[in-house]
């Protein structure tokens, strides 16, 4: 094996990067890149760069570096190595190139709290600063399904309509996630890119709206279905739940969460998962009360 590691000042081969990510996901059961990173790869986002490891003509490892919109000189980094090239120093070589090319603060995600990730972070002086938990629950055959959906007075739920609801959703999303480092900075372009993905289904993108003004979005539950692969069945996801701050305390968040879970159960999914920050005690209490249990953790390391 002769692996070459090369830094690039752009994303010159998006299709190969997405294919590499899929190989890693199939082997690990978890995606190595976030949805936002995949959006940035496919769109060729300005400022996004990468380090690529190749064995001949084959892409066998890569790190993607994306500048954060709301933090000057801070970069999100995600790295993966093809299953057949692991434990051979490829990740260390990629990280060495990253250290030389990134001038600023690095926030590197390790999808799965693995010993190899911890060793690599320690080697390059990164400190764990954030735990993102994955929770799961069974819905197929569960006695509590369908969950009770108790909406505040004057509110109803309808599906998202492409071409109608983008701006209203962006408004409530930015308000609901004003303090969230990823979700709150989604742009119209990011949303439209997701609308073009094969997994996007507006029927599972639930909006809570005013009965008097159905274009006024008060909250939402965006669900997602991960297709099955091999022996692994399809998996539902509570992709994002948000409520306008004016509606907090009304029970709308719980009602939307329950409605989305019911939708996924009706679609025939056996399990539903979600991500939540470990220090978000209010959200943890809600999800645990709805039957979710801890399953997996992603760790952010910072320089």
From Swiss-Prot:
List of residues binding acetyl-CoA 1: 79-81
GO biological process, any: mycothiol biosynthetic process
Binding of acetyl-CoA 2, residues: 241-243, 248-254
Annotated NCBIfam families: mycothiol_MshD (TIGR03448)
HAMAP family (alphabetical): MshD (MF_01698)
Source organism, top-level taxon: Bacteria
Enzyme Commission number(s): 2.3.1.189
Pfam families linked to this entry: Acetyltransf_1 (PF00583)
InterPro entries: Acyl_CoA_acyltransferase (IPR016181), GNAT_dom (IPR000182), Mycothiol_AcTrfase (IPR017813)
Subunit comment: Monomer.
Domain N-acetyltransferase residue range list: 3-152, 155-303
Keyword Transferase: yes
Record-level Gene Ontology MF annotations: mycothiol synthase activity
Enzyme kind, highest EC tier: transferase
UniProt keyword tRNA-binding, yes or no: no
Family: Belongs to the acetyltransferase family. MshD subfamily.
Catalysed conversion reaction: 1D-myo-inositol 2-(L-cysteinylamino)-2-deoxy-alpha-D-glucopyranoside + acetyl-CoA = mycothiol + CoA + H(+)
SUPFAM superfamilies for the chain: Acyl-CoA N-acyltransferases (Nat) (SSF55729)
Keywords per UniProt: Acyltransferase, Repeat, Transferase
Positions bound to 1D-myo-inositol 2-(L-cysteinylamino)-2-deoxy-alpha-D-glucopyranoside: 35, 182, 224, 237, 275
Protein's name in the database: Mycothiol acetyltransferase
General function of this protein: Catalyzes the transfer of acetyl from acetyl-CoA to desacetylmycothiol (Cys-GlcN-Ins) to form mycothiol.
The species this protein was found in: Kocuria rhizophila (strain ATCC 9341 / DSM 348 / NBRC 103217 / DC2201)
């Amino acid at each position: 094996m002769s692996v070459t590691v090369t830094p690039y000042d752009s994303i010159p081969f998006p299709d190969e990067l997405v294919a590499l990510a899929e190989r890693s996901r199939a082997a690990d059961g978890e995606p190595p890149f976030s949805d936002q990173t995949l959006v940035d790869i496919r769109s060729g986002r300005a400022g996004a760069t990468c380090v690529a490891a190749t064995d001949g003509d084959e892409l066998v490892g890569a790190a993607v570096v994306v500048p954060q919109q709301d933090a000057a000189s801070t970069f999100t980094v995600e790295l993966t190595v093809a299953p057949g090239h692991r434990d051979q120093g490829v990740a260390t070589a990629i990280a060495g190139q990253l250290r030389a090319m990134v001038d600023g603060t690095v926030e590197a995600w390790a999808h799965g709290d693995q010993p190899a990730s911890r060793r690599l972070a320690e080697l390059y002086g990164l400190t764990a600063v954030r735990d993102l938990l994955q929770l799961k629950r069974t819905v197929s055959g569960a006695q509590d399904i369908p969950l009770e959906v108790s909406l505040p007075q004057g509110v109803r739920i309808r599906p998202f309509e492409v071409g109608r609801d983008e701006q209203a959703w962006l408004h409530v999303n930015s308000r609901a996630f004003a303090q969230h480092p990823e979700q709150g900075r989604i742009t119209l372009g990011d949303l439209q890119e997701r609308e073009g993905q094969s997994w996007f289904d507006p029927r599972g993108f639930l909006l809570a709206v005013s009965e008097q003004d159905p274009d006024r979005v008060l909250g939402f539950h965006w669900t997602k279905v991960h297709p099955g692969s091999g022996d692994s069945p399809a998996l539902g996801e509570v992709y994002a739940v948000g409520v306008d701050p004016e509606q907090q305390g009304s029970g709308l968040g719980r009602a939307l969460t329950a409605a989305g879970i019911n939708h996924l159960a009706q679609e025939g999914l056996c399990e539903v998962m979600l991500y939540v920050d470990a220090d978000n005690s209010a959200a943890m209490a809600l999800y645990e009360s709805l039957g979710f249990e801890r399953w997996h953790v992603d760790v952010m390391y910072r320089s």
